[in-house]
């Protein structure tokens, strides 16, 4: 038997084995009722056995999509995927739940987990231990996380997750402002004053209350002065003196 034919047969065997394993797994769970699957899945979840938990919880949706246990399994599996650090699947499960139950009992939780996932999904383990290095973070996922928490608070202001979501929004705001300020300083140091002023302006307009607002105003003032835009510089100076009377540029 030649090598290419042998490899072809092996590949076919592997494909059949993979398919058979998948089919066997589904078949092996058919003798469970929806309630048994939910109980087993939640027990595995409590033991931090996320892989098994996901298998049982997902089986409910596949085998018993219209049973009352399906709705609970859909919220449980969001948490299981999140804890397993399968962030893409966690987001998919959360989005599906939100689509199916836009005003559901646990929809606030789905938004909350989306916010957590978007904050953590592109960070390394080192960034999770030392989250202050804003220059290393992905701004787009931070912004997505901010929007998730913001949506949660708007739609479910009395949610048990609302207070923590608000705290996380403030933290994200400060990280975004820190990143924008670093960029503004980068442009200013290279005499790209228009770009520096624009970055600083973004902080003031969109990240109100961040500790970086003071430095952003200073960069705007100095940038406008360097550009010879005296009117804009004086406008910024008035705002600076009004809000930070003890500061000097």
Locate predicted features.
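Acidic, polar-rich low-complexity tracts and alpha-helical solenoid repeat scaffolds
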Residues: 18-249
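Sec-dependent bacterial lipoprotein signal peptides
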Residues: 1-19
